[in-house]
Amino acid sequence: RFLQKLVLPDGTVFNCSVISFLYGKAVGELKGERLIAKMRDIGEMTAKLHLQSINRDNSVRLERPHWDCESFFGENAVWGHWQDYSLLTESDRMLFSKCEALIKQKLAHYGKARDRYGIIHADMHFFNIITDGEKDQLIDFDDCGWGYYLYDLGCSLVTYSAALPELTAAWLEGYEKIRKLSDGDKKMLPLFLLLRRIVRLAWLSSHADSDTAKTVGADYLEATKELGEKFLAENKVD
């Protein structure tokens, strides 16, 4: 029963393997106060995951991809280039180019110390977390690799613009029950929220035929632009 053949309506066949069945529903189905409350739990879970990375035996070689500026914005960026997203105007490209430059600069200053950069999930959005009301379980580790710990927050909130401050505060409250962040770390939270949204534009472009890309439209872009404008207004390029 753990090996199944899945046939899609168009005749495409997938051979699927199952390790175990997880009962519950995706956190992404929760709304309002229930979602904010669950965000505290997700913050705790994320911190526990990061502590596993921080305390791991570095003598054990772990070959996983890196999620850094080269992977996000480089010539061979993993998901392609945000500039190729079809809905962008020239004004949008100018805005996000400024954001990219500032993100690169600030990440260079932030650095990759062991308490800031290590093994992360790298795709911890709410439909990759299954909850039965008491127990939360994380799935889909194919993107797991080396990256900035706070990038996992950006992944969790990549599709949310409403109640973003409340969700971020709830995540931080849960996270710091397990692992304290420095003031320098906390100042970087808006950067990682914006970073993931910009990188997702590249994914939407390179996966334009996917169901997800077809359902994401102007609202996502507008919310990303608002975050970008706020980020630039509150920071400056040296």
Model-predicted segments: where are they?
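All-alpha amphipathic helical-bundle segments outside canonical DNA-binding/catalytic cores
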Residues: 37, 183-193
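Short conserved catalytic/interaction loops centered on acidic-Pro-aromatic/His motifs
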Residues: 55-63, 187
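A glycine-centered beta->alpha junction motif in the catalytic cores
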Residues: 18-30, 78-87, 198-214
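Active-site acidic catalytic loop and adjacent metal/ATP-binding pocket
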Residues: 101-150
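Active-site activation/catalytic loop segments of kinase-like enzymes and analogous catalytic loops
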Residues: 149-180, 196-212
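ATP-binding pocket architecture of kinase catalytic cores
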Residues: 1-58
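ATP/Mg2+ or Mg2+-diphosphate-binding catalytic cores
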Residues: 200-238
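Active-site catalytic-loop/activation-segment of kinase and kinase-like phosphoryl-transfer enzymes
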Residues: 17, 63-109
